[in-house]
């Protein structure tokens, strides 16, 4: 099903796996996303990952926000099932090989009209890998 994934990934630097999750599964994950956001909002922790730098001060308001947490699978069994999904793992294997290791998961929510800017940036220096084998599954 994803035989051309590796060649497209190597040529363009990305691969869009259309139809990986059906509408019913996406609806479940959307509901879980909202539930996790509600849960972390109630935690009292600072969950605003607003960039807040000179790069963004001219393009966003001072009350902008982007709600953020790590390790989403710890908040939700549905999210855990998603990252363990056989089809997702098969696509991942076709891109980087069979020795797949989960580095981390993240959740971001930008509120309408005041979502924080998040400039393009490169994280490789924080997470160096051999043969550029770290990918993001979004």
Regions found by a protein language model. Give the residues of each.
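Non-heme Fe(II)-dependent double-stranded beta-helix
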Residues: 1-12, 18-120, 126-129
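Short, conserved beta-strand element in jelly-roll/cupin
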Residues: 128-138
């Amino acid at each position: 099903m994803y035989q051309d994934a590796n060649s497209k990934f190597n040529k363009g630097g990305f691969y869009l796996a259309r139809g990986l999750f059906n509408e019913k599964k996406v609806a479940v994950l959307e509901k879980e996303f909202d539930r996790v956001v509600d849960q972390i909002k109630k935690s009292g922790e600072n969950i605003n990952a607003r960039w807040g730098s000179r790069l963004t001060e001219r393009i966003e308001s001072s009350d902008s926000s982007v709600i953020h947490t790590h390790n989403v699978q710890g908040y939700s069994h549905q999210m855990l099932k998603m990252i363990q999904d056989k089809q997702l793992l098969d696509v991942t294997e076709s891109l980087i090989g069979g020795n797949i290791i989960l580095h981390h998961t993240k959740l971001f929510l930008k509120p309408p009209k005041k979502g924080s800017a998040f400039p393009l940036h490169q994280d490789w220096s924080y997470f160096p890998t051999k043969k550029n084998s770290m990918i993001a599954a979004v």
